Amino acid sequence: MLDRDVGPTPMYPPTYLEPGIGRHTPYGNQTDYRIFELNKRLQNWTEECDNLWWDAFTTEFFEDDAMLTITFCLEDGPKRYTIGRTLIPRYFRSIFEGGATELYYVLKHPKESFHNNFVSLDCDQCTMVTQHGKPMFTQVCVEGRLYLEFMFDDMMRIKTWHFSIRQHRELIPRSILAMHAQDPQMLDQLSKNITRCGLSNSTLNYLRLCVILEPMQELMSRHKTYSLSPRDCLKTCLFQKWQRMVAPPAEPARQAPSKRRKRKMSGGSTMSSGGGNTNNSNSKKKSPASTFALSSQVPDVMVVGEPTLMGGEFGDEDERLITRLENTQFDAANGIDDEDSFNNSPALGANSPWNSKPPSSQESKSENPTSQASQ
């Protein structure tokens, strides 16, 4: 964001560059020039100007969704009024209806700031000047802070207008005071203000009315668009507002569980668990390696799959998984059912004690008396 002091409001064509400013943008000094154009258009006002003229004025200088805010302090406390695009034309018109014959804005040392899609103009020393011809010629100077946001496009229209009034002064020419110096009643009338905080009664009454009109803009727009009765428009708006209030908050998108990658064994062959441990293996958490067969693998080998961390998320699924591989030839249940195959195993020698059958119960009984007699 770039801030700079652009000086007082220029009164020259846009092709003329102010000395000392080296900024080269496609818009030149466009924000100041837009205020100059706004003042020039307001000077063209006549009493014959109707609603169409004011609507064209607002369309030229304000966005369709523009908001205008006025803040000031009266005897009964601070006031703040915010109106939308539909009510902005009537606001400027109310100033002239209150007795003003001329309106323009003077900016001293405004600061221009560039943002993504708009340009802001902040002037802490802004003066709104109005000329009044009735009941006596009076110049009203309203001092305050003006903050504007212009859309950064070819039209450079105002999106936000915020004028905060601090004080005001009402100036009367000395010649008029000299003319009525001998008239006490006239002097007493001249000493009274014709505005409140720089705003006429016509403008103040309109701003108070906007407190009611602004919320009704949705009803009026719906009535004009759908040709509904005022009661139906109110019911529809209230129902939609109620739906927005009771609508459940949108649930955050749940993240799909990451699929565990299959881990291949070093030999690339498959292994399967024994049939005797089917129930136990189902109750435990299996890894993909537990479904591999052991037909072509070296027997009695414990294989541990390496965890895959690249491309995955850290968590429980990234822990090292150790799978116990059961060899069917050492299964106790299989050994009981297939005793002959166990005894005829080539791993056992001919003189192995495992090949001799245990003596029967009758032979053991006949040997016992002999052993006792020898003793």
Swiss-Prot record:
GO cellular component terms given for this protein: nucleus; transcription regulator complex
Every LIM interaction domain (LID) domain range: 300-339
GO MF, one example: transcription coregulator binding
Chain segments carrying region Disordered: 248-294, 331-375
Modified how: Undergoes rnf12-mediated ubiquitin-proteasome-dependent degradation.
PROSITE patterns hit by this protein: LID (PS51957)
Keyword annotations of the record: Developmental protein, Nucleus
InterPro entries, per database record: LID, LIM-bd/SEUSS
Localization annotation: Nucleus
Any single biological process term in GO: positive regulation of transcription by RNA polymerase II
Gene3D superfamilies: Cysteine Rich Protein
A matching Pfam family: LID
Tissue: Ubiquitously expressed in the early gastrula before localizing to the dorsal region of the vegetal hemisphere, which contains the Spemann organizer. Expressed in the CNS, pronephros and tail bud in neurula and tail-bud stage embryos. Expressed in multiple adult tissues including brain, heart, lung, stomach, intestine, liver, spleen, kidney, ovary, muscle and skin.
Record note on domains: The dimerization domain is located in the N-terminus.
Name of the protein described by the UniProt record: LIM domain-binding protein 1
Organism: Xenopus laevis (African clawed frog)
Organism lineage: Eukaryota, Metazoa, Chordata, Craniata, Vertebrata
Record gene name: ldb1
